[in-house]
């Protein structure tokens, strides 16, 4: 029981350490609201040196030598995009895709579905929808998708049955070889459990 308690204590300790590490990695939301950092423009170790200076120009020997450079740190430049960030799409003044209003152009633009007679002007257009479930006189086996699904399903079913029969034959053959022979005498003989009362 002691190893289980030790393991639980270790898990709690690791969870606490991970939570404290996660709290130190959080960026202050005020910095994001002020616009200091944009996507990918977070400060880097290379940003410590000023513009026009290389990190090799300074001769530093330890961790305390960078304290003098903190006053000269310049933040990243804010780049304003040239394209406005709104979603407004300007209207084109030229002749783009316009909806025809003349009846002759509308008739030329009509799409007539197959298996349906051309639409007469006196009939209701909404009732002329061709659906596969409403087509009369068609056999379900005429469709290639249904036929392909039946063939593949039949092949998979036959293979499953063959493998099941082979598994049963293998187990029966294994029993015939004697690998499951229970008639052997055990090596260890159980001692008699006679109780004596005094």
From Swiss-Prot:
Recorded family membership: Belongs to the syndecan proteoglycan family.
Identification of the protein by name: Syndecan-4
Entry-listed glycosylation sites: 39, 61, 63, 95
Post-translational modification note: Shedding is enhanced by a number of factors such as heparanase, thrombin or EGF. Also by stress and wound healing. PMA-mediated shedding is inhibited by TIMP3. O-glycosylated; contains both chondroitin sulfate and heparan sulfate. Ser-39, Ser-61 and Ser-63 can all be modified by either chondroitin sulfate or heparan sulfate, and the protein exists in forms that contain only chondroitin sulfate, only heparan sulfate and both chondroitin sulfate and heparan sulfate.
Gene Ontology terms: cellular component: cell surface; extracellular region; membrane
Signal peptide span: 1-18
Phylogenetic classification of the source organism: Eukaryota, Metazoa, Chordata, Craniata, Vertebrata
Extracellular-side positions: 19-145
GO process terms (BP): cell migration
Annotated source species: Pongo abelii (Sumatran orangutan)
Residues in the Cytoplasmic compartment per record: 171-198
Pfam family, one: Syndecan
Keywords, in A-Z order: Glycoprotein, Heparan sulfate, Membrane, Proteoglycan, Secreted, Signal, Transmembrane, Transmembrane helix
Keyword field contains Nucleotide-binding: no
Places the protein is found: Membrane; Secreted
Membrane-topology descriptor: Single-pass type I membrane protein
Membrane-spanning ranges: 146-170
Subunit comment: Homodimer. Interacts with CDCP1 and SDCBP. Interacts (via its cytoplasmic domain) with GIPC (via its PDZ domain). Interacts (via its cytoplasmic domain) with NUDT16L1. Interacts with DNM2; this interaction is markedly enhanced at focal ahesion site upon induction of focal adhesions and stress-fiber formation.
Protein function: Cell surface proteoglycan which regulates exosome biogenesis in concert with SDCBP and PDCD6IP.
Domain of life per record: Eukaryota
